From Swiss-Prot:
GO biological process: methionyl-tRNA aminoacylation
Organism of origin: Methanocaldococcus jannaschii (strain ATCC 43067 / DSM 2661 / JAL-1 / JCM 10045 / NBRC 100440)
Sequence motif: 'HIGH' region, positions: 10-20
Keywords: Aminoacyl-tRNA synthetase, ATP-binding, Cytoplasm, Ligase, Metal-binding, Nucleotide-binding, Protein biosynthesis, RNA-binding, tRNA-binding, Zinc
Protein name: Methionine--tRNA ligase
Cofactor(s) this protein requires: Zn(2+)
GO molecular function, one term: methionine-tRNA ligase activity
Domain tRNA-binding: 550-651
Binding site for ATP: T323
Self-association state and partner proteins as the record states: Homodimer.
Length: 651
């Protein structure tokens, strides 16, 4: 069996932060290193995603070429991954010639197989810049809150928007007023693959259950997919002036980057005895579990993913990470202050991969000092120091002559090897690390119970220390995928190779491998983080003062939600019927991710009643419900603190 491990392509608009490391890169590197350790045929392929609107926007605003932006961040991202100890057999760029050619060949095959068609759509066009404008190239006034908004989203009120909904829209490059023009786009017949995708997902035995459920829910309402964009930066669609939508061409990078290894790429993508594991963050689960397999099925030549392994979100000190709000810890900054292996240990031990978890500096210090160092570090150091002092090398004995308590610990080593193997292959990386920690606890207990310092019989002492060193060697072997640098440092002290055999080599002079984290460093990092937050808050845009007459223009009333239902086409919107006393109104609200429809019925809310009606996702909205949102993205509806009748004025 062959294994192909891939990691989500990092977007070249910034360096990596701890969230990237936790959800994607460290877990993928662990299984890659482990399978390699076990002698499996395995490769790890990754790279960077270089196309899409955000990169062209950044380039145009900074007066640089997209190539310059891409090159800068591609190099920074690779440096970050090197610092984390993440290894690749191939690491490419989607702006490389090999990728562009592979993506175009893939597209032409989809077209040849009848899965591509053209359809006329309407889009904003800038007559000054002489080009069509994707969502993010258009900004204007939000029709709901009056704040500055992008063509796809209002940062002020959190609403999902369509570009045509904006008031006073303008081109973000020249600030000119755009026109609405017709253009032909290319579509992928994803809806035609519903049956094949359902069958694939249901039969994917190694696919994590939560990924299966999410994919099957999406497949219920499968729509064809607009796969072209009217911009110049990207992979050109053959025979057109358009480029491919980034989510069509980026996953093809897994194939094109494997091609960087030469003809062996065919073994992993064309021959059937291969398992493909895609490691990603959970925000792009659907792209990898539905869209990408759909593309592969339509193409007809390549292996399908065996498993899509989606990692949960990482919050920071209890708050949602935000690069724009400077509430973030960059990989480069972190490893300047702390060992990368400590980060690898902590991020895996904090929670199962599929669940969200929080990074806390204090918890990081406690887990490393009180768990990793006090248990694993303490046991390995005691054993190697004592053995070096007594014999200068690992004593080799006949295992058949060992006492029962010795054999029990060695049996525990074998059981741990089996448990770790099963858990890592099932993507239960935390469970496997707990298995390793428990073996160290057993080793410590054995060492204490045997009291080697009190043993006068030299042969018996050799048996005890052989058993301890065998346990240390097992720990080092199993820890290597998690903490490669620390494991290799321990192996160097033992003068051993990275396997499970004890050779009785001369030990090197012991030294402390696992050093405790200094609380001073922790406080410095926390101070820097909170200072960044204060600076962002101070530097934030202050709203101008207004006259009370502005407030008098707003008709605010208490409403009671009498009906609430989902809008299936939208990820954020709910359709509500609100009683305002003398009438009922239909209101569309972007609170889907925060409230269930059934929990809203009967709730008193505050409504802006004289907002102009507008359509969201094709659904008429006749008002706006007010809600509060904090810096961490938590949302709470505004309500009244005691019962008051619907329709009451808010003054």
């Amino acid at each position: 069996m062959r294994y192909l491990i891939t990691t989500a392509l990092a977007y070249t608009n910034g360096p990596l932060h701890l969230g990237h490391a936790r959800s994607t890169y460290i877990p993928a590197d662990i299984i890659y290193k482990y399978l390699k350790l076990r002698g499996e045929d395995v490769i790890h392929v990754g790279g960077t995603d270089n196309h899409g609107v955000p990169i062209t926007l950044t380039a145009e605003k900074e007066g640089k070429s997209p190539e310059e932006i891409v090159e800068k961040y591609h190099n920074e991202i690779k440096e970050d991954l090197d610092l984390l100890g993440v290894e690749f057999d191939a690491f490419g760029k989607t702006h490389s010639q090999i990728h562009i050619e592979t993506a175009q060949e893939f597209y032409l095959k989809l077209k040849e197989n009848g899965y591509i068609y053209e359809k006329e759509i309407e889009q904003f066009y800038c007559p000054n810049c002489k080009k069509f404008l994707p969502d993010r190239y258009v900004e204007g006034i939000c029709p709901y809150c009056g704040g500055e908004a992008r063509g796809d989203h209002c940062e002020v009120c959190g609403r999902h928007l369509e570009p045509f909904e904006l008031k006073d829209p303008y081109c973000v490059i020249c600030k000119g007023k755009p026109e609405i023009r017709k253009t032909k786009h290319h579509f992928f017949k994803l809806s035609a693959l519903k049956k094949e995708l359902e069958e694939y997902i249901k039969n994917a035995k190694e696919m994590p259950e939560h990924v299966k459920n999410m994919a099957l829910n999406w497949i219920k309402e499968l729509h064809d997919w607009d796969i072209s964009r009217d911009i110049s930066w990207g992979v050109p669609i053959p025979g057109t002036n358009q480029v491919m939508y980034v989510w069509l061409e980026a996953p093809i990078g897994y194939i094109s980057f494997t091609k960087m290894l030469g003809e062996i790429w065919k073994k992993y993508w064309l021959e059937k005895d291969t398992k493909i594991y895609h490691f990603i963050g959970k925000d792009i689960t659907v792209h990898h579990a539905v869209f990408w397999p759909g593309m592969l099925i339509a193409h007809g030549s390549f292996n399908l993913p065996t498993a899509v392994v989606s990692g949960g979100y990482l919050t920071l000190e209890g708050r949602k990470m935000s690069t724009s709000k400077r509430w973030v810890v960059w990989v480069k900054d972190f490893v300047k202050n702390f060992d990368a292996d400590y980060l690898r240990y902590y991020l895996i031990m904090s929670a199962p991969l599929f669940k969200d978890c929080d990074f806390s500096f204090d918890d990081f210090k406690n887990k490393i000092n009180n768990e990793l160092i006090n248990i694993i570090g303490n046991f390995t150091h005691r054993v190697l120091t004592f053995t070096h002092r007594k014999f200068k090398k690992v004593p080799i004995v006949d295992e058949d002559r060992l006492k029962e308590e010795d054999k029990e610990l060695l049996k525990k080593c074998e059981e741990t090897l089996e448990a770790v193997d099963k858990n890592i292959r099932s993507f239960k990386f935390r469970d496997a690390l707990v298995n390793i920690l428990h073996l160290a606890i057993e080793g410590n207990s054995y060492f204490q119970k045997m009291e080697p310092w009190a043993v006068d019989d030299e042969e018996r002492l050799k048996e005890i220390l052989y058993t301890c060193c065998k346990t240390v060697k097992t720990l080092v072997y199993l820890l290597y995928p998690y903490m490669p640098k620390k494991s290799l440092a321990l192996l160097e002290l033992m003068n051993e190779e990275l396997d499970l055999e004890l050779r009785g080599n001369e030990l090197k002079k012991p030294k402390i491998i696992f050093k405790k984290i200094d609380n001073k460093k922790i406080e410095e990092m926390k101070k820097k983080l909170y200072e960044n937050k204060k600076e962002e808050t101070k530097g934030g845009e202050k709203m101008e003062q207004i006259d009370i007459s502005y407030l008098e223009k707003i008709d605010l009333r208490v409403g009671e939600v009498v009906e609430a239902e989902d809008i299936p086409k939208s990820k954020k919107l709910l359709k509500l019927m609100v009683d305002l006393g003398d009438e009922k109104r239909q209101i569309v609200s972007g609170i889907k991710g925060y409230y269930k429809p059934e929990d809203l019925v009967g709730k008193k809310v505050i409504v802006i009643c004289n907002l102009k009606p507008a359509k969201l996702c094709g659904v008429l909205s006749e008002g706006m419900i007010l809600a509060a949102e904090d810096d961490e993205g938590n949302v709470s509806l505004l309500t009244v603190d005691k019962d008051i009748k619907a329709g009451s004025k808010v003054r």
